[in-house]
């Protein structure tokens, strides 16, 4: 494509603060591009002083002088660049930010997208690595790109689309790198366009901006010769182009527009550069450990310690790999396998993986919350032993929302013994809402009921099936227990082709029961709990006297009542109390962490206030001396 003429005109700088559809499809307020460019020329292109994401928001800026609003003009809301950074801190995990960008591409399947590519390139200007996301979806027209790069705008209201808040692009790109440039082509109403926009934290910081602005250019490519889409004046276009070339990875207009050559007639390419470093001064993302993958650095691998073989075996499982391998994480990120869509990482397609396909002794349990009234609230919970059990003590539930993995290997039971080892479940819970970073769920009453139900399912499945892996059928000694016995009845379930027990998996220490009568099965587990604030160093009160329930059938089981309650009712009540106790302990720990976090934030704010007070005093002295 020939370069654009130098006297062409394109859009003004757009402010990143609006969700309006007004102003002829151009979102947000505008400021003179030449004014912004004037500020841009004051500083040479360079990276931020602090390249660590978690420290990049700690700086003080002397605000620019705000130009008075002209008569008849509406004042637009101003968004400070520090808000852009703080908004991205919702992503504690870098792969969570990458998943947000993958969600955007997956949502484009309805517009014809067949792939999304994730790769690494080297920036010619300084030979630094950059992250590239590219899809062949419908692309974005000029108005669409402005909505994408504006705060809080979301037009995704479908029951199948994943995005919902309208902040995913901004928070995700900022979490991965300081700067991002977007190239997009689309066709709307017979008009084909291509647009370029840059969201640069480096530019905003280095030029002392106190308002987030996004330089953009738009081109009409419907005709034989590309024509600029004019919103302002030739001077504004020249200033916009100057900003793009100065703060993007591309030094000339030709290099900039060449990025469209592999986009095709429609699609989007996002380049994230000035990637963040960790505390040791090396890139947070690793591109060299595996040329077919993008990895997070696992500090425990290089600590020089020799690990036990069981720990090494545990780290070989995907439940551990997905924390550090993007390929492993992407393979499980979506529950249903795509038919005509591929996720391609560094040139190689990702093979989708559903851990439920390899379950041993799988079962399906239908679940619907009592308060649910819609069909969307019911779900099927697939549960079974992982194929590596009992060798690996993997456990937990992979919980999806609208086909997207939110909580991988969520452990709902407390550790301390072998109960639940090897038991893994998979479910799609569309009746609860994910958190903003899509790495957890909102703590609603529906979520709490689901958690309690999953605990019961794990216990029931374990007691009904643990002997199939060679574990002893649990029998609590009559003369030895200072713990609470937790019996449970297995829920109504449908068994899916249970496999015979391999002879090499049978324990030699006890009898193996090959047939299970689920209707008559009884089981028990011993767990001790004390009030959290009365525990000593061993975890129990010194005067704590646990209760023991005999797991063997008694006369009460056949109809005799104790204080009006049968033994079965007492056992059920005991189970409920046990699960409530677990929940309270978990809430107590979460509350303690929250208090510590708030205390830390309070100290930080006190320090900043003291610093600001010193600056104010110094300013007053300067004014008095003047």
Curated annotation (Swiss-Prot):
Entry's localization field: Nucleus; Endosome
Residues that span the membrane, as ranges: none
GO annotation (BP), single: regulatory ncRNA-mediated gene silencing
Top-level taxon in the UniProt lineage: Eukaryota
Coiled-coil region list: 579-626
This protein's UniProt keywords: ATP-binding, Chromatin regulator, Coiled coil, DNA damage, DNA repair, DNA-binding, Endonuclease, Endosome, Hydrolase, Hypersensitive response, Kinase, Nuclease, Nucleotide-binding, Nucleus, Plant defense, RNA-binding, RNA-mediated gene silencing, Transferase
Record has Kinase as a keyword: yes
Effect of deleting the gene: In the double mutant crt1-2 crh1-1, compromised resistance to avirulent Pseudomonas syringae and Hyaloperonospora arabidopsidis associated with compromised cytosolic calcium accumulation upon infection. The double mutant crt1-2 crh1-1 also exhibits an increased sensitivity to turnip crinkle virus (TCV), and reduced defense response mediated by flg22 against Pseudomonas syringae (Pst). Impaired non-host resistance toward Phytophthora infestans and altered systemic acquired resistance (SAR) triggered by P.syringae pv. maculicola (Psm) AvrRpt2 cor(-).
GO cellular component entries: endosome; nucleus
Subunit structure, interactors included: Homodimer and heterodimer with MORC6. Component of an RNA-directed DNA methylation (RdDM) complex that contains at least MORC6, MORC1/CRT1, MORC2, SWI3D and SUVH9. Binds directly to SUVH9.
Family named by the database record: Belongs to the MORC ATPase protein family.
Name used for this protein in its record: Protein MICRORCHIDIA 2
Organism per entry: Arabidopsis thaliana (Mouse-ear cress)
């Amino acid at each position: 494509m020939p370069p654009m003429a130098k006297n062409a005109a394109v859009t003004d700088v757009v402010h990143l603060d609006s969700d309006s559809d007004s102003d002829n499809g151009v979102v947000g307020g505008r400021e003179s591009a030449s004014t912004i460019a004037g500020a841009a020329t004051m500083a040479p292109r360079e990276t931020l002083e602090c390249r660590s994401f978690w420290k990049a928001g700690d700086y003080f800026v002397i605000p620019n002088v705000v130009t008075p609003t002209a008569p008849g003009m509406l004042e637009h809301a101003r968004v400070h660049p520090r808000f852009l950074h703080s908004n991205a801190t919702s992503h504690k995990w870098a792969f969570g930010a990458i998943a947000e960008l993958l969600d955007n591409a997956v949502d484009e399947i309805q517009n014809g997208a067949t792939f999304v590519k994730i790769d690494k390139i080297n920036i010619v200007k300084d030979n630094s690595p950059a992250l590239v996301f590219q899809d062949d979806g419908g692309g974005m027209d000029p108005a669409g790109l402005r909505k994408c790069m504006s705060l809080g705008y979301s037009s995704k209201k479908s029951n199948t689309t994943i995005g919902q808040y309208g902040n995913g692009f901004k928070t995700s790109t900022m979490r991965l790198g300081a700067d991002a440039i977007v190239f997009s082509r689309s066709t709307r109403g017979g008009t084909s366009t291509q647009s370029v926009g840059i969201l640069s934290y480096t530019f905003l910081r280095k030029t002392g901006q106190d308002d987030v602005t996004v330089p953009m250019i738009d081109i009409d490519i419907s005709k034989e010769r590309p024509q600029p889409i004019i919103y302002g004046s030739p001077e504004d276009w020249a200033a916009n182009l100057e900003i793009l070339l100065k703060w993007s990875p591309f030094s000339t207009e030709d290099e900039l527009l060449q990025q469209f050559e592999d986009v095709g007639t429609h699609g989007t390419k996002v380049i994230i550069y000035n990637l963040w470093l960790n505390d040791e001064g090396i890139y947070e993302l690793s591109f060299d450990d595996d040329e077919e993958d993008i990895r997070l650095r696992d500090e425990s691998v290089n600590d020089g310690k020799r690990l036990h073989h069981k720990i090494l075996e545990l780290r070989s499982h995907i439940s551990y790999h997905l924390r550090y391998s993007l390929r492993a994480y992407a393979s499980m990120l979506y529950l249903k396998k795509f038919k005509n869509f591929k996720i391609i990482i560094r040139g190689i397609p990702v093979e989708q993986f559903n851990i439920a396909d390899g379950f041993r002794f799988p079962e399906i349990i239908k679940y619907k919350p009592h308060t649910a009234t819609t069909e969307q609230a019911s779900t099927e919970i697939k549960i079974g032993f992982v194929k590596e059990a009992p060798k690996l003590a993997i456990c937990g539930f992979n919980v999806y929302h609208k086909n997207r993995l939110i909580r991988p290997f969520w452990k709902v039971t407390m550790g301390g013994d072998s109960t639940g080892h090897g038991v893994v479940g998979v479910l799609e819970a569309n009746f609860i809402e994910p958190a903003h970073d899509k790495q957890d769920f909102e703590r609603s009453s529906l979520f709490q009921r689901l958690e309690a139900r999953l605990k019961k399912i794990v216990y029931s499945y374990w007691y009904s099936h643990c002997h199939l892996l060679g574990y002893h059928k649990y029998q609590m000694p009559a003369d030895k227990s200072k713990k609470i016995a937790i019996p449970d009845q297995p829920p109504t379930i449908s068994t899916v082709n249970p496999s015979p027990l391999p002879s090499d998996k049978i324990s030699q220490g006890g009898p193996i029961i090959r047939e299970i009568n689920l209707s008559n099965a009884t089981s028990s587990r011993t767990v001790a709990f004390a009030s959290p604030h009365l525990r000593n160093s061993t975890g129990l009160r010194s005067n704590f006297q646990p209760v023991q329930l005999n797991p063997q059938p008694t006369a009460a089981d056949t109809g005799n009542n104790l204080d009006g309650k049968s033994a079965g009712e007492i056992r059920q009540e005991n189970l409920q109390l046990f699960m409530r106790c677990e929940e309270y302990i978990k809430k107590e720990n979460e509350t303690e962490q929250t208090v510590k976090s708030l205390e830390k934030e309070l100290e930080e704010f006190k320090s900043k206030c003291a610093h600001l007070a010193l600056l104010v005093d110094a300013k007053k002295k300067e004014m008095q001396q003047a």
